[in-house]
Amino acid sequence: MSTRTVFRVHPTVNFARFGTSEDFYLSPETSAGMDLPGTRTTGGLPVKAGTEATFIDRGDLRDGDGRLKRQAARFRLYAYDLDRPDRYPNGSGTEIVAGTRLADGRTVERIVWTVHLANKKANNYNIVSSMGVQAFADGQVPQLRNPQAYGTPDSPSRLKALVIDPGPRAIIGTRGVEGEGPVRFNAETTAACSDGKGGVTPLPAYPMTFPSGQLYQPTGPLDTLGELRTDEKGRLLVLAAHGRTAAQIDEYGVPVQLVGDTNNAGWFDDAADGPVSATLVFTDGTTEEAFAAWVVCCDPGYAPQIRNVVSVWDDVYDTWVRELGLQPDLCDPATGAFQPGYRPGFEQHIRPIFRAAALQRWTVNLPPIAQAAHAAVDSIGPGDNPDRTIMAGLTFIRNPNANPAESGVGVPLMPLSLGDAGMPFLTVTRTQYFFLEQWSRHLFRTTGGDAPLGPGEALDMASLSNCLGGRYVPGIEVSFTIRQPDIYIQDWRETGAGPFRIKPKLLDYTTAKAGTPFLSGGWIPLRDDRQGLEPGDLAKFMAVPWQTDYNSCSIHQTSINTAGANAATGNPLTLYWSWPAQRPDAVHVADDVVDNVLAAQKWSIRGPGTFAINPRSASTFQDPLDAVEKWDRIGIILQGTAIDGTTSPDYYLEVESRLEGPGDPDSPVLPWPFSANPSPPAPQPRPHGTGHRRGR
C-alpha cells in the first residue's frame, strides 16, 4: 500500500469557556492533576495567551476591572503519513502551521478555518435526569421544551423562534507577528465559509436567528455566540460568548420564572457547539481538506487541575474500547470481552484514577480520616505490591459490573459521588475497572504502557480528561450523548480520520435562503441516524440556562436519583456530592492561609443570599436568579505554584472570588458525613421573575 498524507484538526473536541471579560487565555493542553516533567505544577492549567505553553497564574484569571477572562479553545493541524489502515495509538503526527514545508515539497501558505456555532437548547426535548439516554429508547421522546411553541423540532416556526443560529464564520490563518480577528458570531457579521479553493465565500442570505421580542437580559444582550481569531502561526482560536441569558416576558409584563434546574421554558443562554474545519492552501495553489474537529462553548473551569474520577475522556475511551473496536488487544471487538492477557501501564492507566481520588479533598468537606485514606491511595507507586496497599482486593471500589444493588451502597465503596440515570452512586467505567482488576492481579506494567501517544492524540486525551464525566444530569461541558457510538466517525481506520472524532453532517451552505431556517431539529440518540451532527446538537442536551444547573448540582441525598437510601446505612438523609471536581463545594481560601497552615473551609458559593436552612442547599445561591447574575464572581481553585511564590505546591486553593462577605458564620462547613433536615420548611413565596431552587 502506498503512503498517503492526511491532515487532522486536534484536539478532536475542545472547549471554549465563558467569561465576562473581552480578554482571554488558552485552553489547557495537559491532563488535570497529573505530574509533568521538570516542574511541581500538575496538569490542567490553561495557557497564557500569546504563548506556546506558559501556564496562567492567579493574576491571569481576571482583567483589570475584575471581570472573569474567557478560555479560548486553541486548535492545531497535524499531518499523518499512513501506509496501512490506521491504528490507535498511532504515535506519530507532525504539526502543520502557516509556512510549514511538507516532505513532498509543498509549503503551507495559509489555512482557511470554518466554524459553525449554534444553540438549539430551547427547541430540544426536556432532559429527564433520572433516565438519561433511555428517555429516547424504543422510539420515545420526552416532552419538548417550550411546548407552547406549536410543532415539532423541525417545524420552521419553532426553528425561527427557538434556535440561536448565526451561521458559519471563516477566518484565514497566516504567518505573521499577530493573528487575525476577531470574527464574531453576531447578527452584524456576515456569515461565511471556506470555498474549498483557498478563499472565503460570503453568505449574505444566510438566515440568522437570535432571541427576539421583548426580553429580560439581566447581564447584557444575548447577541453573539462567540468569535474566531488566529494566532501568529495560523492556528485557530475559538472564543465563547459571555455567559449571558435571556428570558421571555410573560403576560403580566415580568420575566418568565426559573422553575427548575434543567428545563426552563422561555429562557435562552449563549452556550453553543459546532464543527471546526480547515482547508490548507499551498504556495503552488493546491489545497487539502483536514478532518474536522468539534468545539463546545460552556461553563468556566472553576477547578482546572482537580481531576474527575471519571472524566469525559474516561467515558469516551470506554465507549471506543468496548463498542467501537479501538484496541483489539485490550477488548475483543467480536465479543466485547476484555482480553485477560492485556497489561495496563501503571502511570498511563492506574495512576490517573488514584490521583483523582486524592484531589477531591480540595473541593469537598472530607473529614481528616478520609483525607488520609485518599492520600494513601495517591501514594501507591508502580513498585508497590497491590496486596499490601490500601486498595488491596479493590475492597473499596464500586464494581460497575456487579449486581445493580451494589450501586446503592455508599460507604465504604468509592467513588462517594452521586451517579446518573437512576443510579444512586457513581462507578468508574468498565474499562477503568478492568485496569484496576489487572493491577490487583499483578498483571500490569510498572513502566511504559500502550505505544506512546502522538502529539495530536495527546491533545485529544488532555482536552477530554479536563471535563466532567460519569454523572450527566445533564452535565457541565457535554451530556450523556457523548457516550453514544453513532455520533462518531467509525470508518476512521480506512479514511485516516483517527478516533474520537465527531461526525459532522454535510451542510451545503450554497442552499441557504433568507427567511428559511437552514438547520433542522438535528440528531437525537437511539435512532438509526448516521448522517452526523449539526451545529448545536451536543449543547442542546444541556440545561437551559446553564447557570441554574451549575448552581443546583452541589450536595444531595441519594433519593435525588432513586426512591431508596444508602444501602450501607439505610439513611436517606445523608448528603453526597454531585460534581466535586468540576463544581467545587467546600474550599480552602488562599488568602486565609498563613505560613502554609490551612484555615477552615468555606463554601465555594457564599455570602449574602446563600444561607441555607437545610444543609442540602448549602453552597448555592438560594434564588436561582442570583446564579444567572453572579456566576462570574465564584472563585477559581489553583495549585499553590500558580498562586504565589510561597504557597505549598501540595495545596489547591481558591483565589479571586468576588462573592461578597467572608462566608456566613451561621452556615459553617461541617466535615462529612452530614445530613439533610428531615422536614424542610415550606418554600417562601418569591416575587415574579425568580423561582424556587429545586435540588436535583
Spans of model-derived segments:
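Aromatic- and Gly/Pro-enriched helix-to-coil junctions and flexible linker segments
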Residues: 2-696
